[in-house]
């Protein structure tokens, strides 16, 4: 059995080893393996229409994909870090993308968007929320996302739709560091 001298790693060295291991597991090896963001027409909660991914406003865009209202807490765990990233790099924008089945119907979709608009007092936040009414299976397939809707996904996407990085679940410093490294690599 191979024995590694990890007991000799202290403080910063141990963190660096852990960071490298986590980055290797969080970052995709290629955009093809990570998927391509599909062509979608959708509106934000300020009722501005977008043709995605080409009308994402950043050269690089962080999209937080959620499937259930109960996942908002997971989304919220990311927001302070995403605001810091956006403030520090003018080429990066972030969006919240609630993904809802297109079979929901026009009236229910209108009710859902209206409820979200009423529940979000900040105009800036409403502008960042773009509700996607899509074929969920086709959407997940295009992005190579698991079929499960038990967690959120955080993607770094360019305007051509290439997924450059992927993370999932609640915010962690290690996953955020991996995201920042992917942004730096793709500037």
Where are these regions (language model features)?
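Short, internal strand/loop/helix patches
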Residues: 95-97, 110-148
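Bacterial N-terminal signal peptides
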Residues: 13-26
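Short active-site neighborhood of thiol/selenol oxidoreductases, capturing the structured segment around
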Residues: 55-75
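Boundary at the C-terminal end of the N-terminal hydrophobic targeting segment
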Residues: 31-34
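Thiol-/selenol-based redox modules, centered on thioredoxin-like
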Residues: 141, 150-187
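Structural microenvironment flanking redox-active thiols in thiol-disulfide oxidoreductases
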Residues: 71-122
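A short beta-strand-turn-helix
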Residues: 40-60
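N-terminal secretory signal peptides that target proteins for export/translocation
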Residues: 1-11
């Amino acid at each position: 059995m191979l024995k590694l001298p990890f007991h000799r790693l202290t403080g910063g060295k141990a963190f660096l080893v852990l960071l490298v291991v986590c980055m290797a597991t969080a970052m995709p090896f290629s955009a093809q393996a990570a998927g391509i963001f599909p062509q979608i027409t959708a509106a934000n909660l300020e009722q501005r229409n977008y043709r995605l991914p080409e009308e994402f406003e950043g050269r690089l865009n962080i999209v937080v994909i959620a499937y259930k209202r109960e996942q908002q807490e997971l989304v919220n765990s990311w927001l302070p870090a995403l605001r810091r990233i956006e403030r520090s790099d003018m080429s990066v924008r972030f969006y919240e993308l609630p993904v809802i089945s297109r079979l929901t119907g026009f009236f229910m979709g209108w009710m859902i968007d209206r409820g979200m608009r009423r529940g979000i007092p900040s105009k800036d936040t409403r502008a960042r929320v773009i509700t996607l009414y899509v074929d969920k299976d086709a959407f997940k397939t295009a992005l190579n996302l698991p079929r499960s809707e038990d967690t959120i996904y955080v993607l770094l996407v360019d305007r051509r739709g290439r997924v450059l990085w992927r993370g999932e679940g609640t915010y962690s410093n290690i996953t955020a560091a991996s995201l920042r490294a992917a942004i730096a690599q793709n500037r």
